[in-house]
């Protein structure tokens, strides 16, 4: 009995150390950013981390309250653990182009690596930096760890890349706001006036959609005028190649509309000029495309007629962690989800653990699974199809911003997820 009591006490102490509510920012952190750069490399079955550099940057744009992640989102996560007290003092989940590439046919034949950057507040004392990956069974496994000594003179303290920046919207304090750094990609020096106007327009598109609209006064919007030699991104399928600051390209993973950059080093070098919670790469083109990867970045074409719809859809991926709800053959990934595991995204389910998804939001008396018929249009139910899979995966409504460009608003389930992320980020 005494041993049991001791064990219970030890478990309670350990749980307290991991409690996000117990972490005081000023005790553990400076109001600066610790940036860890590395390569994520491997193939369809393996992943490895290759450390590249560690930097101390001028601005911390994130919250000073919600320091430990409470969502459990992302195919990867990083943690910062205070060495002396063994307290978990910061953590976040994230996604990566590397993880998406692992689900392509090419990953079965060769190895690749993708640049990755994690940012967190700069620790006052020695801390252990840990990267975990989520395996096929949905369980996090340690991938890499490294001791961060804030006195280490190999931690770079370089001046940020010389890029003109301006605050176009918002008056809030960085730690209590959602700071979005819009990075210019494919804009020449002569096109910077257009870039600033494009930022205001695209940001306006996102902030006109609920629940972002209701919290619009909690957003700070920055424009970073990173100059490219050429105008527009690469379009490999048309043999068009441009010299741009972030080397953005259509046809990522041979999907024509997938418009991305792999140059996260330069992207973060540019963004370091301002405090930021999320980076939005605005790409100067009238061709349809974009991308959004959770806690990685959001990108969007500036001038396509559907850029309004694409901007909010991709921001749903990048900032909130929402899944795609479509299930046609227009993507290049294979078996992206294990149907025996509940996906981490809040707006799709395999029914393995539906209780923690939108079960409480189901329309009273609705049939489950819910037929995709006119009778159930606009109702919250359990509709088969989502996450690129037509069978075994379910989504909340027949149509949503995360499924097609036909909807002006997110569905109730996605709106709830968006609001949770907004409130977490602003420290509420």
PLM feature spans:
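Active-site recognition of the HExxH zinc-binding catalytic motif
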Residues: 308-325
């Amino acid at each position: 009995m005494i041993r049991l009591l001791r064990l219970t006490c030890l478990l309670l102490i350990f749980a307290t150390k991991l409690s996000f509510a117990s972490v005081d920012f000023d005790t553990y952190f400076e109001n600066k950013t610790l940036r860890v750069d590395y390569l994520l490399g491997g193939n369809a079955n393996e992943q490895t981390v290759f450390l590249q550099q560690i930097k101390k940057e001028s601005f911390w744009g994130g919250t000073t309250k919600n320091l430990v992640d409470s969502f459990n989102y992302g195919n990867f996560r990083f943690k910062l653990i205070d060495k002396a007290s063994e307290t978990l003092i910061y953590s976040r989940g994230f996604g990566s182009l590397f993880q998406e590439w692992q689900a392509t046919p090419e990953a079965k034949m060769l190895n690749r690596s993708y640049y990755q950057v994690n940012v967190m507040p700069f620790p006052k004392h020695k801390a252990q930096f840990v990267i975990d990956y989520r395996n096929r069974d949905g369980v996090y496994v340690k991938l890499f760890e490294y001791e961060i000594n804030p006195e280490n003179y190999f931690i770079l303290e370089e001046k940020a890349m010389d890029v003109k920046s301006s605050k176009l919207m918002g008056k809030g304090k960085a730690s209590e706001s959602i700071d979005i750094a819009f990075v210019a990609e494919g804009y020449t020096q002569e096109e910077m006036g257009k870039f600033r106007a494009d930022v205001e327009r695209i940001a306006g598109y996102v902030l006109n959609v609920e629940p972002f609209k209701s919290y619009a006064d909690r957003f700070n919007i920055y424009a970073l005028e990173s100059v490219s030699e050429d105008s527009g991104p690469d379009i490999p399928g048309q043999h068009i190649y441009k010299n741009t600051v972030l080397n953005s390209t259509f046809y990522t993973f041979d999907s024509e509309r997938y418009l991305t950059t792999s140059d996260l080093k330069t992207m973060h070098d540019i963004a370091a000029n301002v405090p930021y919670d999320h980076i939005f790469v605005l790409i100067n083109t009238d061709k349809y495309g974009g991308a959004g990867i959770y806690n990685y970045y959001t990108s969007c074409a500036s001038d396509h007629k559907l850029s309004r719809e694409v901007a909010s859809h991709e921001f749903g991926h990048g900032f909130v962690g929402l899944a795609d709800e479509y299930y046609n053959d227009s993507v290049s990934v294979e078996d992206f989800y294990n149907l025996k595991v509940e996906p981490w995204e809040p707006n799709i389910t395999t029914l393995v653990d539906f209780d923690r998804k939108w079960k409480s939001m189901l329309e009273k008396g609705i049939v489950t699974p819910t037929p995709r018929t006119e009778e159930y249009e606009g109702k919250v139910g359990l509709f088969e199809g989502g996450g690129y899979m037509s069978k075994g995966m379910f989504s909340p409504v027949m149509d949503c911003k995360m499924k097609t460009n036909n909807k002006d608003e997110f569905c109730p389930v996605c709106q709830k997820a968006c609001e949770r992320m907004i409130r977490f980020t602003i420290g509420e």
